[in-house]
């Protein structure tokens, strides 16, 4: 019973992580509420009944989960959402040992933290933390206190619509005068160049290998 969930492939491409709800009781398929989402790992070629439970939060039945397995295979990042507001909690698990616990990185719903990617223990997010028009923020999971956070790309006069890490660079998609403006930065936040368009328009969906 998969709803409100994408999938995130493991680095070895042998399976993927996803969120699902318990199967409703007989006769309640189209009546029961969406409660108690859980995160599972599905190995390709095996029945869904064999999927491994990765995370659940029964004390918070209204929470939903979006999964991101990092490209280097080291971490599973879970974005926790509640309702429709762009305010998220963030959890992560070190995948080097199956017994490692799920750790709270952001333990409140006060701001947006949209996961972009990672460089080792540094996790990159598009965020409105102290930045109403959004910034790119980096958090070291080994030193997660907010005083150690780094604003990689500060808030600009334009609104940061989306961001991604592609080919070792940050691609920042801004909305300026109802049209797209694309700027490229290195992972330390140094400006590299602006992508010029032949005319007025919009562009989005910048992603690929980090």
Question: Which residues does each predicted region cover?
Answer:
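Peripheral, non-catalytic segments that deliver or gate enzyme domains
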Residues: 1-210
């Amino acid at each position: 019973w998969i709803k409100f969930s994408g999938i995130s492939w493991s680095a070895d491409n042998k399976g993927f992580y996803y969120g699902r709800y318990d199967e409703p009781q007989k006769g309640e398929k189209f009546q029961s509420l969406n409660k108690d989402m859980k995160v599972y790992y599905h190995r390709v070629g095996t029945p869904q009944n064999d999927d491994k439970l990765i995370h659940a939060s029964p004390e918070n039945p209204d929470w939903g989960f979006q999964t991101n397995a990092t490209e280097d295979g080291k971490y599973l990042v879970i974005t926790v959402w509640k309702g429709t507001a762009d305010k998220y909690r963030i959890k992560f698990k070190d995948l080097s040992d199956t017994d490692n616990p799920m750790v709270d990185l952001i333990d409140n719903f006060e701001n947006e933290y949209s996961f972009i990617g990672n460089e080792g223990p540094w996790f990159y997010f598009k965020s409105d933390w102290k930045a109403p028009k959004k910034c790119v923020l980096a958090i070291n999971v080994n030193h997660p206190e907010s005083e150690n956070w780094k604003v990689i790309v500060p808030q600009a006069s334009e609104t940061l619509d989306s961001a991604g890490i592609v080919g070792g660079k940050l691609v920042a998609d801004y909305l300026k005068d109802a049209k797209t403006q694309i700027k490229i930065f290195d992972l330390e936040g140094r400006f590299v160049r602006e992508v010029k368009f032949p005319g007025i328009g919009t562009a989005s969906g910048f992603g690929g290998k980090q």
